[in-house]
Amino acid sequence: MRKIIIIVAVVFLIIGLSYFSHLNPNDQVSKPEKPINITFTGDVMLGRNVNPALYEDPQPFRNVINLTNGTDLTVINLESPITNSTNPRDKLITFKADPQFTKSLKDAGVDVACLANNHIMDYQEQGLNDTIKNLKATGIMYVGAGPNITEAYKPLIIDIKGKRIAIIQASEFADEYYMPPATRNRPGFAPISWDHIKSAIDNAKKAGADYIICEFHYGNEYRYTPNELQKNISHKCIDEGAFMVVGHHPHVPGGIEEYKGHLIFYSLGNCVFDMQNPETRRSMIIVVTIRGNTSIVHIYPINIIGYYPQLMDVDDANAFLDELEYYSNVEIQSKNGVGMIKT
């Protein structure tokens, strides 16, 4: 009898070992997802008065370097072509930056430059082509422009910590004479068009994107609240599966909207710029922490001193965050001059 019991026990042991040996160790203990931290800034313009200042101090992000160089990804709106071209477009205001200062962006931790805006074509197609060449040579990715509209609307795919991030970028402002967009046969930037945006979102999904971020150059200058086009496009993006929407162009910080559990930042304002109006010199840099289906956004209020950003002191930052909340439909918690939004 004892012998039978021993034999039965051995059989069950073998069966049990066989079962557990086929289990994937990763299935037995669920590991928490690693957070992904992404920094976003508003307009970075390295031309006009900023360009000569860069010869004196080539590190425009010196005072916020922990924000731009301390996360998994940093995304800026590059508001000036990087070119030596001497052939500007015939328009009132044109910007360009010395190509040597592309390195200033790389040294600051900039990973992605958004190119779809109303100044990227200031120095014609050559200016755009030079910008792309200089960014590539420095190891900075770009989105929102290209040799044709298909490439300009191509989602930028970035793999971070086992997750796939897709960035889609376009500009509201397109004009055949002053700021010509990309076409089927012409280089340029991606002009806002819902059909193209939806197609880009679909392509990002097909590419296996876990998080789709839409970034737009849109809105009215010096206006703190979104217009109907901004709201309509942003809501549609969320409806189609975008994780969040980030905007710039108004030169002032805009309101923040939570829509169906996702955040829309209608304007991050300026970051590196030479505008003198006090309202255009108060802005923010945001750091988005994504984990699973949730996000925590930290808002860092900045002042532009000279032409470069630096963090506000606590009292000014708290006042800024109170004002920002007034223009938003979200609660902004503040601690030590830093705002926080959870979704």
What are the residue ranges of the model-derived segments?
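Acidic, metal/ion-coordinating pockets
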Residues: 6-7, 16-343
